[in-house]
From Swiss-Prot:
Protein family according to the UniProt entry: Belongs to the ZW10 family.
Gene knockout outcome: Accumulation of the precursors of the two major storage proteins albumin 2S and globulin 12S in dry seeds.
Ribonucleoprotein found in the keyword field: no
Domain of life: Eukaryota
Taxonomic lineage: Eukaryota, Viridiplantae, Streptophyta, Embryophyta, Tracheophyta
Endoplasmic reticulum listed as a keyword: yes
Official protein name in the record: Centromere/kinetochore protein zw10 homolog
PANTHER family named among the record's database cross-references: CENTROMERE/KINETOCHORE PROTEIN ZW10, CENTROMERE_KINETOCHORE PROTEIN ZW10 HOMOLOG
Pfam families according to UniProt: ZW10_C, ZW10_C2, Zw10_middle, Zw10_N
Subunit-level organization: Interacts (via the central region) with MAG2. Forms a complex with MAG2, MIP2 and MIP3 on the endoplasmic reticulum.
Cellular compartment(s): Cytoplasm, Cytoskeleton, Spindle; Cytoplasm; Chromosome, Centromere; Chromosome, Centromere, Kinetochore
Disulfide links within the chain: none
GO (cellular component) term, any one: kinetochore
Keyword annotations of the record: Cell cycle, Cell division, Centromere, Chromosome, Cytoplasm, Cytoskeleton, Endoplasmic reticulum, Kinetochore, Membrane, Mitosis, Protein transport, Transport
Amino acid sequence: MPEIDALFESINVRDLLAGHDLNDPTTPLSAPDLRLLINRLESHSLRIKSKVQSYLVAHHSDFSELFSLCQDTVSRTRLISDDVSDVLQLVSDRPIDVEIRSVVDEITEKTKEVKLKRESLDLVNAIVGICEALQETKEALKNGRFRFAAERIRELKVVLRIGEEEDGEPVAYALLRKEWSNCFDEIQEVLAKFMENAVRFELDSSRIRIKYQLSVGETAGIALSTVLEAMEVIGILDYGLAKAADSIFKHVITPAVTHASTFAAVEDLCKSAGEVTEATLRLEQSSDHKFEDVDGDAMYSGILKVVKFICSSLCFGNVTWIHSFGRLTWPRISELIISKFLSKVVPEDASKLADFQKIIERTSQFEAALKELNFVSSSDAESRLSKYAEDVEVHFASRKKIEILAKARNLLLQCNFTIPQDIAMRNAKHIVCLLFSSERCVVSEAASQLMNLVHKTLEDVCVSSARVASEFYNAARDSILLYEAVVPVKLEKQLDGLNEAAVLLHNDCLYLFEEILGLAFEYRASFPSSIKEYAVFADIAPRFKLMAEEVLQKQVHLVISSLREAIDSADGFQNTHQIKQFKSAEFSIDQVVFSLKNVHMIWEPVLRPKTYKQSMCAVLESVFRRIARDILLLDDMAADETFELQKLIYLMLKNLSSVLDSVRSADETSRPLDDIIPSLRKTRKLAELLDMPLMSITSAWESGELFRCNFTRTEVQDFIKAIFTDSPLRKECLWRIDEVNQ
């Protein structure tokens, strides 16, 4: 009704109040405005009613048709509702759906029963068939029809799914599998007995016999080929041939390798009625038994003859059978050839490596012949014999490396680390020149021989191929490192005490340190280019330098500790004016002197002069400093006591004259001993102070003489207080000493 729609859209309240400002929402409408609005809305309402009435009158027929159609639709809906109600009433009175469901369930159950019975029948038929097949197999086995029995065993293995068992299978299947297993074991045992009967080795006549017509128990006239075919069918070829392969390897192949020069194999065939019934291989003494098989030609020829006999007489040229026999024997044959022949003909000298080429060629030809016979698989990429022979340089170098390391280890273990008293022998074997310091040094025989071995090995590196040179280089490094690993452990007990072995170890390490540093300069230029890239020795040199210092420092520490214990027995040199205390102090000094002389006797002949001087000075400094300190710590000394103390000091210095002279002679600078051993000057001065007047002591301090002797102000003052009684003069002297700035 477009007209009605247009009428409603034409109503606009704003137009009805056109005279009023409606833009301002806060402006209220007045009573006249509202009355005007009501009047105008009533007018519009009348107009709308008039329009609607006019529209209905104009479309009366259309509205009549619409109402009639609606009435017909309602009537039909009522009829359909009545029909549906009737159907529902009918269904509720007779439940046909329940009857249909019951029939369907019954049909399903019967179908399942029929299917189950059919499956059970099929299972029974299958079980009966398998049982009959197993029985036929047993009968065939008894009658000697091995090929038929073997094929049945193979078929039944598939049917019974041997090795593929599943949970929930019928119990009958488990029983049938057990029966099949028993049948398989039986045929395997029977075939093995026939094979054992077929191949025999007679020790007395040294021959191997292969029979072609076999019999075991009541079963006779079985062909060897039939037995082999049956074993192949059921997959026990390796098992069946294992015993024969072991016998042939032990009694035929092994002599062919170990006694190749005295071995000869002669093949013979035995015929009956035109058929070959037996093949024989006899081992005879070779007429050329005095000939030495240098290049392995006789050995390879003998083995090849045996293999050909096996391929033709035992395996009948069947590739599968030959492969099986080869798998069983070739690994052992190759290992035997390597251990008994190839490893023993590896050259012992690098110059003889070229002569080994003939053996390499003959070995390659031998393996190629075996591959041609299918004895060795052509896909076997190992070619273990050829590879071993071609790698002879590596084997040679490996063996030489083992020999070098064994020699190095033996000389280190056998050396007793002592120096003979015979000077001539010492000069000949134990004195070496240090490479960088140009000093002569006494070393152990082990160190000198070890470096001789290293030098010889590195000389071989310079003239060897890359692979050999690499092994020799590693052997040289490892030989040096063996010293570090072996000697300290061997001398472990000696290193815990004062002895010649410890200082020899120090010298050895120093000598090895300088020698190792010089190795690269001496040989690296002549090394093969591949070795130059990584050939270094400087990385292992510092550890020997460090070891030398540690050993020497430990010796010095042990000596100083021993001397301190000896000095401790003097009880601080107290009361030496008493006979008992004096004897104790004197014994302590004698012990110190004896120990120092013993150290002198051990160190001086072995250590370098410079090292001897430094070490002995450290020891003497410790002794003199300790004795001077103990005496200066005395807080009260009688006149007789100072005399006895002075006597002890002079006695000690006199008895140590030889030791002090050795230090003086070892010093290249010719400096006074007092400068080399500061506490020696202090000890000597202390002996003078013990009988010096008070004023002289004071003057000596004021002049700086005592300060230059390493006395401190406190030591001088305490010394004066200990010797001299309290008096104005002592106070004055102490004051004067205190006033001097030094």
